[in-house]
Amino acid sequence: MEDIDIARQAKLQNITNVAEKLGIEENYLEQYGKYKAKISNELYEKLKDKKDGKLILVTSINPTPLGEGKTTISIGLADGLSKINKKAILALREPSLGPVFGIKGGATGGGYVQVAPMEEINLHFTGDIHAITSANNLLSALIDNHIFQGNELGFDKVIWKRCVDLNDRALRKVEICLSGEKNAVPREDGFDITVASEIMAIFCLAEDINDLKRRIGNIVVGYNKNGEEIRARDLKAEGAMTVLLKDAIKPNLVQTLENTPALIHGGPFANIAHGCNSVIATKMGMKLADYCITEAGFGADLGAEKFLDIKCRNLPKTPDAVVCVATIKALKYHGGMPIEDIKEESIEYLEKGIHNLLKHIDNLKNVFGLNVIVGINKYITDTDKEIEYLKNKLEEKGVNISLVEAWAKGGEGAIDLAEKIVDLCEKPANFKYCYELNDTIKEKIEKIATKIYGAEGVEYSDEAEKIIQDLEKNGYGNMPVCIAKTQYSFSDDAKNLLCLEPFKIHVKNVILKTGAGFIVILTGNIFTMPGLPKVPAAEKIDIDENGNIVGCLLYTSPS
């Protein structure tokens, strides 16, 4: 059966029944039909003095283009914990329409471990991302209107970009204000994908609506002729922008196919943004259940590093345990096996690729001081010989492992992982950040590059050098850094999978995000507006005469 058929056959519970499992009274719910609801932020005020549950982070090795199943493992783990009578909840990101219609597909899991209603979550859901797009573009409209109406603030340079939640490379650089009207000042502009926008980052890091408004007001949108900053609050924009987000800021409650509760809220990418769901949803999840399972996008070099160095500075606790997801196909890919041959058995390529997994484990254990288990996401094409080889190699290294068959068996296929996670959460961790906030900007970049990526150093463009000097001079040196880098490699070269030769990280630009509270470091050939592949997933998605969606809304299943 296709994933979409499995999802349609599931017996979902009314969302009020799902909420009841968590002890949420109906008056705290704002229902969007039978199976979705927003949770009033007043609930957190009621629960804030309650002890936090265990926090489990799910991350992975560097992925192949179709992903390795972090969401699948996360959902399977939550269902597995429920099967052994543990109170569990998921705290995941919302899917972006970019990947849904691009190459990767949706982000609601697969097989018998999905969050539902799958089609609605993968498309417009409760409208959060559209609200974020509107807030972002309202600010753009206010900037250009201010300039048109006389430019009282003296804009000389505008750095704020518009956004849209689609992969559209044609919008990376555009010319605007070409109407020829009096006072219209033509200028170069560009679009980011919404999930890489500063509004999305702010949305996911804000503690509450007041913090959201404060952060929005802090956004630097441009500079005057004297090089002085112009902020969103100078345009009196923060109030109207926050109004657009007043409902979006409330976490969304849904369920898995096995009726385990799930909070899905916020969705920044991890390669070009910080890659974690909202702080609000994560904090609420830890109050509502004994085990809160969350994930960070792409590999542990990106999402997990940003979760630990950026998001955890805004959370009351750090992870009690980490699951590092690995697949045999990805390990063979990192061993140099051509992607078209990836389903063929090969111990040779598997052996070469294991170093990628071992580097991620070393980072999580020795750089961050966390308790780690490897979740091997079993694919139909994995052979017994490959599985045994991988398990033996990891056991030789003293690595905790669990073979997970949740895609095919649901929560039942993740019981071993669930039991091991319960034990792992009881072991003390010795968490430490990769860098300290009082390190210089360059020290932060270089610590991540050398400790996490394994680079021998960092090279900076002249433009990046100047921006870093200016940021330090203007008092921004104590901010965390968010490195935008390819997800496919430890290096900034997507084709350098093996990373066996010494390499350097190349910083080409630096962007200050005062509202989000971090500095974005652009490396290699990374773009904040992705493009579509030659054959987009959109070509396979359709709707039949009865109104049923057909085609692939999910990533390719483990086959």
Residue locations for each model-derived region?
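Inter-motif core of Ras-like GTPase G domains
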Residues: 310-328
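N-terminal phosphate/diphosphate-binding loop that engages ATP/GTP or pyrophosphate donors
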Residues: 44-46, 51-56, 80-178, 186-192, ...
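Long, compositionally biased intrinsically disordered regions
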Residues: 462-542, 550-553
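Conserved C-terminal guanine-recognition region of P-loop GTPase G domains, centered on the G4
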Residues: 336-337, 347-376, 384-387
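Extreme N-terminal, non-catalytic leader segments
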Residues: 3-60, 85-86
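Glycine-rich phosphate-binding P-loop
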Residues: 58, 62-75
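Hard-cation-handling environments
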Residues: 367-371, 376, 381-382, 387, ...
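Conserved small/polar residues in nucleotide/adenosyl-binding loops
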Residues: 555-559
